[in-house]
């Protein structure tokens, strides 16, 4: 395992995940009966400040269909949490106008790359074009100097 699991912190993330899903209208409990489901949700809401008990609630009441999705969410959150500790692994964000994002996303999709890889490739292409233009300009000046000496 690359990233250390921190039980209290991750239990808090799980609690927030489940509450968010409940507020979005998803069924977070394994119960079909509305009163049993609401009872379990009320119990979950009361556990906000007791992260260790959240795991017990999950084992007892959580909808099995949410298990893998929650694991993926927590894994991604753990990765972001630990990557944020170091400048070189910390994610940066930029604001793009929608049309710019749309064109960039289309280009990335056509190239089969991520947005970040596409941006790096575009920067490298621009740098190479600039180097080529400078080299051609230098060759042109040298050629003119040679022809001018005759």
Swiss-Prot record:
Its main location: cytoplasm. Coiled coil: none annotated. It is found in: Cytoplasm. GO terms for molecular function: sequence-specific DNA binding. Gene3D superfamilies: MatP, N-terminal domain (1.20.1270.380), Met repressor-like (1.10.1220.10). It comes from the Bacteria. GO terms for biological process: cell division; regulation of DNA-templated transcription. GO terms for cellular component: cytoplasm. Keywords: Cell cycle, Cell division, Cytoplasm, DNA-binding. Pfam families: MatP (PF06303), MatP_C (PF17414). Signal peptide: none annotated. Required for spatial organization of the terminus region of the chromosome (Ter macrodomain) during the cell cycle. Prevents early segregation of duplicated Ter macrodomains during cell division. Binds specifically to matS, which is a 13 bp signature motif repeated within the Ter macrodomain. Homodimer. Belongs to the MatP family. This is Macrodomain Ter protein. It comes from Escherichia coli O1:K1 / APEC. The gene is matP.
